[in-house]
Amino acid sequence: MTMMITTGNSFDGKVIKQCLGIVRGIVVRSPTISQGLMGGLKSIVGGKIGAYSQMCEHAREEAFQLMIEHAQALNANGIIAMRYDTGEIGQAGTEVLCYGTAVII
């Protein structure tokens, strides 16, 4: 089944038949030792921290997929108002949350 996903509150030309509630995917990641060392050096001299960017992108993708799986478990075929949020966990971890409202179209 194809999952339609939007950051908006509706799908153009579609009628939302039922709202099933909030769905989410949560991932907590921390950098490897080498990523931490490279990130520390980059923070001193400035510039893009590629290892951190890659880690964050993977965490976002994993959280996104977990949100879709949560919606599929509810037999949803759409997710509206999809958002990402992040936060720090302790001194070394980053939480990535992907959430939205599962719907039947």
Curated annotation (Swiss-Prot):
Query: What InterPro entries does the database record attribute to this sequence?
Result: UPF0145_dom_sf, UPF0145_YbjQ-like
SUPFAM superfamilies per the record?
YbjQ-like
Q: Name one Pfam family in it.
A: YbjQ_1
Q: Which family does it belong to?
A: Belongs to the UPF0145 family.
UniProt protein name: UPF0145 protein lpp0255
Protein's organism: Legionella pneumophila (strain Paris)
